[in-house]
């Protein structure tokens, strides 16, 4: 069993399976299925100590409300987190049902299953804060490892190393989709999945099947009232993440280097109507230089001082956001600029 759990694969070690014409192949990013499945089987609450008897509450927010209503001093209480997990077999059953639901909804004839492994290249990028370091303190669902092992054993899932799972499933979806009369669909909830711009692809995300067939892509506003955010697809979405918005969940934020305030809504207004790739890329680098200067200095998470040109800084954040599109993909931001004949100075 430990051999199954410990075995990991680089992108170039995965067999390029050739499917019969007419096949519909689902490429699963199981990290986005397993984690929420395991998490939902944990019922969390708090136990409050400090008065005559211990009492349970759903969460700290609920208890703070009780304190306010009773004029209690919240800070004098001792609070303990508690977790009650459902039996692990329920996790297995929910996971199996979820997979079957995808297969039925999309009429799949074949499936490939992948999990994230170790040695993610982004972990060593010289960012001000280490990539995804905030997740080290996050409590993992009780049955997470058990469900991962179940997927590896029962579904012959493969664990990917050297990159993130969402990189590899993007590669596989695009590669399989190139096969004659074969439709490959990426199954994920990851927001990065819609940034593909190199070839045609399909992504099934939160009940919606996206057909990606535009290099430039688009941007739009999601949400209502004050709770709105910019979303999109293609290059517009990728560059929005890489050079402007970043990702607070993954701990990379280009705005930490901005010399002036500039937000995603301003960016959206500036680029939403641009209709060709070279013009969009030229505007992007001009705006980035305006925001960070021609060079920048900062201390990375290891304590080392970084003195970088705007392009070197852009390359770091490009590496954070860019999802690989082919095996042994070494595409840089500069490669993209040269490909589209965009002029720039360093």
Regions found by a protein language model. Give the residues of each.
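Extended two-metal-dependent nuclease catalytic cores across DNA- and RNA-processing enzymes
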Residues: 2-15, 78, 108, 133-345
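Noncatalytic, basic helical substrate-engagement surface that gates or grips nucleic-acid strands
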Residues: 3-12, 16-182, 198-211
């Amino acid at each position: 069993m430990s051999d199954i759990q410990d075995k990991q694969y680089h992108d170039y070690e995965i067999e390029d399976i050739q499917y019969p014409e007419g096949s519909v192949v689902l490429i699963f990013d199981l990290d986005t299925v397993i984690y929420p499945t395991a998490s939902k089987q944990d019922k969390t609450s708090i136990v409050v100590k400090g008065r005559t008897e211990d009492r349970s509450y759903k969460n700290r927010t609920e208890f703070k409300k009780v304190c306010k209503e009773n004029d209690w001093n919240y800070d004098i209480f001792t609070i303990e987190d508690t977790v009650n997990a459902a039996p692990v077999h329920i996790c297995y059953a929910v996971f199996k049902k979820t997979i079957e639901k995808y297969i039925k909804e999309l009429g799949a004839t074949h499936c490939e299953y992948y999990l994230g492994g170790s040695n993610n290249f982004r972990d060593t990028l010289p960012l001000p804060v280490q990539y995804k370091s905030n997740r080290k303190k996050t409590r993992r669902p009780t049955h997470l490892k058990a469900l991962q092992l179940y997927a590896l054993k029962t579904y012959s899932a493969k664990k990917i190393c050297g990159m993130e799972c969402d990189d590899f499933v993007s590669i596989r979806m695009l590669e399989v989709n190139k096969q004659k009369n074969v439709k490959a669909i990426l199954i994920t909830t990851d927001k990065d999945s819609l940034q593909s711009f190199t070839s045609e692809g399909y992504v099934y995300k939160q009940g919606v099947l996206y057909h990606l067939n535009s290099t430039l892509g688009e941007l739009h506003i999601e949400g209502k009232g004050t709770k709105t955010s910019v979303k999109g697809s293609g290059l517009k979405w990728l560059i929005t993440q890489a050079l402007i918005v970043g990702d607070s969940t993954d701990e990379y934020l280009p705005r930490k280097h901005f010399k002036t305030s500039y937000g995603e809504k301003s960016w959206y207004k500036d680029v939403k109507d641009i209709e060709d790739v070279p013009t969009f890329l030229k505007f992007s680098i001009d705006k980035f230089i305006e925001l960070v200067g021609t060079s920048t200095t900062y201390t990375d998470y290891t304590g080392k001082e970084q003195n970088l040109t705007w392009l070197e800084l852009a390359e770091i954040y490009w590496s954070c956001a860019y999802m690989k599109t082919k095996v042994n993909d070494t595409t840089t931001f500069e490669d993209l600029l040269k490909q589209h004949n965009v002029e720039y100075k360093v």
